[in-house]
């Protein structure tokens, strides 16, 4: 409660009101980020499946080890997604329509984490070393596959897309850990979510902005 008490000048009633506001804001942010993540992973996955099909003849880059350099960029996180998908399948009720079925590519895809998608993109952090092999591999994947996932962005080196995804990933982690949003420019980051989705499909962006309640809750911050 420390950040809320500080913001409320040690007034416990105001601090609790701020805490409740932050929780409600976090829930609305999480909803928007969750939808955005689905759109982003589906768009990137479509291009990665096509790329892996060209490289290996097998479109699934999740169920089996993909071609290099995608293999090295995703190896640990890909295996973790498979493990979670297999665990989920093993927990299916006998009455589940897919009881006993093998996991599919889509099962594994649904169990990927947002951080994996950021890690595949060209790294534009200020202290990045472009000559490192993994960074060259990220650039290669962008040029050969992932740039096409964002057809409405003029982003030849992936700089804009990387920072949009990075900002969303940071906010996603903050919200999932129930960290304070008191000093976070939530509307700016949510704007990145809308722009990112718009770079995939303008219709999806219009739909997403129509569902937003983040701005309404953000504006209702207790004084």
Name every feature range the model reports, one short phrase each.
Residues 1-171, 177-187, 191-223:
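Amphipathic alpha-helical interface elements
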